[in-house]
């Protein structure tokens, strides 16, 4: 049989040439032979169900199932296709166009024009498995022998990824005018997509599945080796042994997930001193640099999907790490936090704030209280602090005041009053969010320290804004 007229049925099923396409389905409809293992398992299940619909329909009864007239019957071509004892059987009176459409598209795309072996069976196979076992036993035996022969012949063609040379040989046999892309061949409802084939093949040989889906199998393995060589250096102290190069389709994904969690958990210790380690996973996840070992173009999932999901995961988990850090910090320092918080609120935001003299060991409190978390968190909170600085400067706060006479030292009365107020606020549940409150209140502490009279007079603008801020934190 000439391979150049093997065209999918939905392209020209009005011409008599397409009558060869029912033979493309050969024995797949009803025969559950081991010959079908590893082939199109999904489409076989699909077409068994369609067999039950088409072949057991009202047209097919046990008496007249052999020569039932049908719209899709091409007697001349069918009798030409299969001769001899099969001549009376090849009518196939039950709508082969609909049921064979998936196999035509499948063999056209995956096998590469394998129609020449399939015409021997004719299309009598659609009766099998449907409770019509009217063939003589000799025909069944012959058919099984032919199945075994075809099993050997189809090995290379069924799996072009296992034998790329055979696939290259069969590629030119396609008709030149036949469109083979997805855009020219929109997949119909009964045509299984290409990913089904790749999934089926990938159970047996994942590397072959990758090379079938992508034309560069070497780039994937190079990608895997690069990944395994880069990843252990990142989370060496977190995972005891490095992950070997991926051998299953999910292995390299899990590898990347481990690397992601590992880099995040390592950034919990180190990211607060070096801000680059926090931003580095996000930059890599954005997928902008194709040279990074994790997002090379040979990934099975598109890099854009991975990057968007990983970006959201990383940002979400980074905030979780931050909240955990704040929580543990609050728990660790809960014992001596009340004294430190009093000192935190009294002294300035940083050392270079208003140059006032320190009293009552405020320098030590500053080291224990506010400066320590700022050092640990590094530049993670710097953008919010800068925004608050800008807000305070816009409201009239001066970091380096020109009038130094405004900067008066604190007195004992002020300290006592402030201790009483903070103790009262802590009883009201003000200290529940501990560290955050001390940070925010310390931002407003220059107003308290510079404006002694306004601090005692609760009707002024600054102290009213202060009390409203405290109420908001309750």
Swiss-Prot record:
Residue spans of biased composition, Basic and acidic residues class: 26-38, 136-154, 317-346, 356-365
UniProt keyword annotation of Nucleus present: yes
UniProt-annotated stretches for the region Disordered: 17-42, 91-191, 238-371, 453-474
Keywords per UniProt: DNA-binding, Nucleus, Phosphoprotein, Transcription, Transcription regulation
Modified residues (Phosphothreonine): 301
Entry's Gene Ontology molecular function annotations: DNA binding; RNA binding
Amino acid composition bias (Low complexity), ranges on this chain: 291-312
BP GO terms, sorted: DNA-templated transcription; positive regulation of DNA-templated transcription; regulation of DNA-templated transcription
Biased composition (Polar residues): 262-277
Function (record text): Possible transcription factor.
Protein name according to UniProt: Vasculin-like protein 1
Lineage, highest ranks first: Eukaryota, Metazoa, Chordata, Craniata, Vertebrata
Gene: GPBP1L1
